[in-house]
A protein has these predicted regions:
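Mature extracytoplasmic or organellar-lumen-exposed domains after removal of signal/transit peptides
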Residues: 1-231
Length: 231
């Protein structure tokens, strides 16, 4: 989508200074945001695959490599996780081949495990800041999705939905942390994900919900404030 390069400034010397990106975003936060961006596409793809929308699922499974991987490749190599490219490529290929959902889910689990290992190299404060940044990217995508107050672009809606699922899962884990500051900040972020739920219907954007991007932008701002408490 049009807002998809928004969080890449930190890696490639100014790559992707799209809407929603901060010019001074910390390289670690930018990297973590991009990692979440990739996982969000895969989460959306997995849910769509399970729902039987294979065409949309294949599109989302392919996007991490097509749109984002080069922005994180160098850092992943430095951290010793260069094999993530092959893991994600294999997952996308399995989706294209229409393998069983169980196989797809298992492969996604391996990708997520690698993501979790990568995240252990970064402190909680930077992870929390990346959730705020990713919510801002979600808001940019969502604004395109509901332009004119109707569901105009379901692909961008899927993107936003997937990004919020990543934040929900990761902040939920940090909320259980032994670090009281990080735990409290993460719990506040989980609350913002829940509040932003009013901007979403079901996976395909059906149902009664508020088609208002400001809900997500407000959630991002509150997450950013919450993340400062973890420093």
């Amino acid at each position: 989508g049009e807002g998809e390069a928004a969080a890449s400034e930190g890696e490639g010397g100014g790559e992707g200074e799209g809407e929603g990106g901060g010019a001074a975003i910390d390289p670690d936060v930018a990297f973590l945001t991009d990692l979440g961006f990739m996982e969000g596409h895969l989460r959306a793809g997995l849910a769509l695959y399970e729902a039987g929308d294979l065409s949309a699922a294949k599109t989302h499974m392919g996007h991490p490599i097509e749109e984002k991987y080069e922005a994180v490749a160098k850092r992943l190599d430095q951290l010793g996780y260069g094999d993530l490219r092959e893991q994600i490529s294999a997952l996308a290929a399995a989706a294209e081949a229409e393998d069983s959902y169980e196989k797809i889910a298992e492969m996604f689990g391996k990708v997520r495990q690698t993501h979790e290992e990568v995240r252990t190299n970064f402190d909680a404060a930077d992870q929390l800041k990346s959730f705020a940044a990713l919510t801002r990217v979600a808001a940019d995508e969502y604004a395109i999705a509901v332009e004119g107050g109707t569901l105009a672009n379901v692909k961008e809606y899927h993107d936003a939905w997937g990004f919020m699922r990543v934040i929900e899962a990761e902040a939920g884990e940090l909320a259980a942390s032994d670090d009281a500051k990080a735990s409290d900040a993460a719990a506040a972020i989980v609350e913002q994900v829940e509040a932003a739920g009013s901007a979403f219907g079901d996976l395909q954007g059906q149902g009664d919900y508020e088609k208002d991007p400001s809900i997500l932008y407000a959630a991002a701002a509150r997450m950013e404030l919450a993340s400062l408490g973890a420093e």
